[in-house]
């Protein structure tokens, strides 16, 4: 099945992997430890879970080809945010001691299959479910 972009699932997954790899590298260079990639529970997935200085960052990665009609940032709408928060809550149930959490968004722009630009938004949204 193809979306309106005309890009098939395999191509989207490949682009997504390139974006996630780039963000993991970015996080590692900034002192984060990658705890988990593609954490999935019923109803949701978190692309990257990383930790630094006792803060767990739940990172949503959106990858787009250069010149796409919609930005990667626009794709993380309130519905997507709610799914991410619920998935993060499921992840945190397995942690015995309280932790500080935040929700970050990484927007990766590709050109010819290579990372052209990476924008990282710390604390891009919160768990308040407005």
Locations of regions flagged by a protein language model:
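Short, glycine/acidic-enriched loop or turn micro-motifs at the edges of active sites
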Residues: 39-41, 63
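Mg2+/Mn2+-dependent nuclease catalytic core
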Residues: 64-87, 93
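Short acidic/glycine-enriched loop/turn segments that link adjacent beta-strands
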Residues: 41-44, 114
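Conserved protein-kinase catalytic-loop segment immediately C-terminal to the catalytic Asp
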Residues: 47-50, 107-109
């Amino acid at each position: 099945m193809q979306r309106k972009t005309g890009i098939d699932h395999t191509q989207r997954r490949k682009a997504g992997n390139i974006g996630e790899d780039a963000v993991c590298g970015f996080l590692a260079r900034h002192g984060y430890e990658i705890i988990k990639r593609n954490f999935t529970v019923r109803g949701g997935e978190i692309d990257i879970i990383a930790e630094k200085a006792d803060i767990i960052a739940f990172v949503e990665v959106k990858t787009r080809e250069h010149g796409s009609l919609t930005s990667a940032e626009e794709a993380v709408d309130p519905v997507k945010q709610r799914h991410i928060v619920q998935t993060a809550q499921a992840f945190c149930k397995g942690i015995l001691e309280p932790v500080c959490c935040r929700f970050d968004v990484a927007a990766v722009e590709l050109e010819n299959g290579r990372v052209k630009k990476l924008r990282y938004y710390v604390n891009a949204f919160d768990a308040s479910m407005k």
